[in-house]
């Protein structure tokens, strides 16, 4: 449905704030084409709505005459709350808040496009809620355990049992982030249940 450059409407970008179910404000940018249909764009780990992937996707959709909304998950970018590693279910609920906001304003969310961690959150959303038929997975992980081995090493479970915690060097969360047995297991396996 690409439109000719001559017929293409001028798009408006508008900052929109949407509360999630925990009362945190999710901040996003609406790329308005004037159509009822809209696509939700979800960023990856250590990124935000201003990431070049999100802005490029919004530009491509604009050129096709499709409205989109790119936003910061809780604890990322301008959105309220604290950053948490492995918070896929919380981010799926952020997507829910965004989807409901647009559905309540008589918009039709035609797709969710997620990159990396955002793709995993979008897939979890789709597994729980069945209201959006198109989910686009851009580099989401097919097996979250692979990510654990990559970040913590192949012996992470043995070290976790022995020491009770694992340290991860993470620039976005300070010099070191510690994971206890409980929060690492919740991260690793809650998504799979």
Spans of model-derived segments:
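N-terminal cap/lid segment of alpha/beta-hydrolase-fold proteins
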Residues: 2-34
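Alpha/beta-hydrolase fold nucleophile elbow
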Residues: 105-116
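Conserved alpha/beta-hydrolase
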Residues: 58-80
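The alpha/beta-hydrolase serine catalytic core
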Residues: 120, 125, 129-193
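The serine-hydrolase catalytic nucleophile loop
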Residues: 46-58, 73
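Short beta-strand element of the alpha/beta-hydrolase
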Residues: 36-44
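Catalytic nucleophile-loop/oxyanion-hole region of alpha/beta-hydrolase
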Residues: 49, 76-107
């Amino acid at each position: 449905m690409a439109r000719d450059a001559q017929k293409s409407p001028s798009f408006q970008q508008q900052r929109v704030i949407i509360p999630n179910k925990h009362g945190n404000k999710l901040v996003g940018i609406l790329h308005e084409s004037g159509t009822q249909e809209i696509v939700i764009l979800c960023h990856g780990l250590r990124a935000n709505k201003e990431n070049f992937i999100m802005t490029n996707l919004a530009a491509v959709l604009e050129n096709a005459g499709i409205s989109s909304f790119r936003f910061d998950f809780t604890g990322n970018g301008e959105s309220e709350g604290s950053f948490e590693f492995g918070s896929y279910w919380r981010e799926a609920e952020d997507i829910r808040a965004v989807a409901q906001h647009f559905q309540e304003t008589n918009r039709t969310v035609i797709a969710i496009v997620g990159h990396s961690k955002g793709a995993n959150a979008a897939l979890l959303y789709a597994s729980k809620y069945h209201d959006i038929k198109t989910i686009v997975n851009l580099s989401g992980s097919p097996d979250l355990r692979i990510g654990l081995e990559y970040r913590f090493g192949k012996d992470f479970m043995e070290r976790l049992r022995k020491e009770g915690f694992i340290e991860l060097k993470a620039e976005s969360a300070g010099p070191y982030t510690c994971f206890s047995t409980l929060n690492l297991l919740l991260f690793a396996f809650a998504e799979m249940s």
